[in-house]
Design a protein with these regions (language model features):
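Divalent metal-coordination and catalytic microenvironments
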Residues: 24, 43, 53, 68, ...
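Active-site environment of divalent metal-dependent phosphoester hydrolases
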Residues: 37, 58-59, 85-91, 112-116, ...
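Active-site HxH/HxHxD metal-binding segment of metal-dependent hydrolases
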Residues: 70-154, 163
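Divalent-metal (often Zn2+) His-rich catalytic cores of metallo-beta-lactamase-fold enzymes
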Residues: 188, 194, 215-252
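Conserved beta-strand hairpin/beta-sheet module of binuclear metal-dependent hydrolase folds
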Residues: 19-72, 185-198
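Accessory terminal helices/loops
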Residues: 2-9, 124-125, 136-141, 226-228, ...
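Active-site neighborhood of phospho(di)ester-bond hydrolases with catalytic His/Asp-centered motifs
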Residues: 52-54, 78-86, 106-109, 176-177, ...
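Core dinuclear metal-dependent hydrolase active-site scaffold
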Residues: 149-152, 157-189
Length: 252
């Protein structure tokens, strides 16, 4: 059954596009949050910005970056953090690198090692597959464009925890996998009381455990509940708060 709970935040403000959360923190949301329709984030500091994930293909990522143009005009994106290795959170990197060729990319070591497992060429081939297999695959991913995607591996990896300075703003990365995948990272902005969870949180949908163990996922929820926060940006679904974390933890 879906992980839905009255404690979760309302979907009333769940609209496609860029949402400002706090001064300099943004979420890019993609309803309905189903397979491939992931969220991303932008953290703007003094003269520079950090992107939390890209989207599933180049066209979607281009539209997202266009929506961020006003925020990044004087604060270019110089770093992207990958929350995990699945393509809906990083296949758009080439579009980001086209606009900012010197952009650095950061991921947990286990995330980097998993990134080669499902290349976009495989997804492109399955989108063209005949018969029931292709029909089923297109029912999930037929709206995405996997041709012409060039992947850029992370330029920096970390284990455990990494703190970054984004134009004077402290951004804390916590490796919490293996859980959803072999490597999962959450991104926390203490000043803004905001956390970007990647696919550690599916709000309004069922959490998918590709790696596990569940104990790690529950521990990740407990870690987030120990943070001073108001706003929670899930990997899929509408914005939530601490109650959304509790609901996912209790479901698991």
């Amino acid at each position: 059954m879906p992980c839905q709970d009255d404690r979760m935040a309302s979907t009333a403000g769940y609209t496609h596009g860029l949402h400002e959360l706090d001064d300099g923190c943004f979420a890019y949301l993609q309803p309905d949050g189903g397979w491939g329709w992931s969220n991303a984030g932008l953290i703007v500091g003094d003269g520079q910005s950090l992107l939390v994930d890209t989207l599933f293909d180049l066209q979607l990522t281009a539209a997202m970056l266009d929506s961020m143009a006003a925020a990044t005009a004087s604060c270019p994106v110089d770093t992207v953090v990958y929350t995990h290795a699945y393509g809906d959170h990083w296949y758009g990197i080439a579009e980001l690198a086209r606009r900012w060729p010197d952009v650095a990319s950061v991921a947990a070591t286990d995330t980097e090692q998993e990134m080669a497992d499902v290349p976009p060429t495989m997804l492109a081939a399955r989108n063209q597959a005949p018969g029931e297999v292709g029909e089923l695959f297109r029912s999930f991913f037929g709206e995405f464009h996997f041709d012409g995607i060039e992947l850029v591996p992370p330029t920096r990896t970390f284990d455990g925890r990494l703190d970054l300075d984004v134009g004077g703003r402290r951004v804390e990365l916590f490796e919490v996998g293996p859980a959803h995948t072999a490597g999962d990272t959450i991104v926390y902005v203490p000043e803004a009381r905001t956390v970007y969870t990647g696919d550690i949180l599916f709000i309004g949908g069922t959490p998918i455990v590709w790696a596990g163990p569940l104990s790690n996922w529950i521990a990740a929820c407990d870690l987030m509940l120990g943070l001073d926060l108001d706003t929670v940006v899930p990997g899929h679904g509408p914005l939530t708060d601490r109650a959304g974390i509790v609901a996912v933890r209790d479901y698991l």
